[in-house]
Amino acid sequence: MSAPTLSPNEFCILKLLWSANHALTRPEILEALPEQDWNPNSIHLILNNMIKKGVVEVEGVARCGRGYGRTYAPTISRTEYAAAQTMDTTSDMSGGERLLGVFAALVDMQGIDEKTTAELEQMLEQKRKELDAQ
């Protein structure tokens, strides 16, 4: 999966949708990001571009003032987006080389605790079983 290139405004909205944990209407987005000073027409264009890029979808409709408005939800998780960005950045490396390199860098930067180590071992064991079954 290739990570779509997002404008700063698109990424700002995507981060808001990730943190909201539910679909938001255009007025809710505007209200949650008052520092952006967007007008309603601008945000409509931004959301339509995000739909075209496949990072946002219209999930439904909700009451907005006297009428109804579409609700927008992300189609990609924060983790999936970060992984796709990383894969694009390291596209000159083989798959295994990328994974090991990124993992080693993250461990060096962030450190790793016993719980995380156990979860990683469990994930690797599950992957081994899947590969053995093939």
Protein language model features and the residues they cover:
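Short alpha-helical segments that sit at the start of domains
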Residues: 1-16, 20, 77, 92-96, ...
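Short, hydrophobic-biased segments on the C-terminal half of alpha helices
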Residues: 44-51
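Short, cationic-aromatic polyanion-contact patches
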Residues: 5-9, 61-83
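Short helix-coil junctions and helix-kink-helix linkers
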Residues: 31-40
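Short acidic, hydrophobic short linear motifs in intrinsically disordered regions
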Residues: 23-32
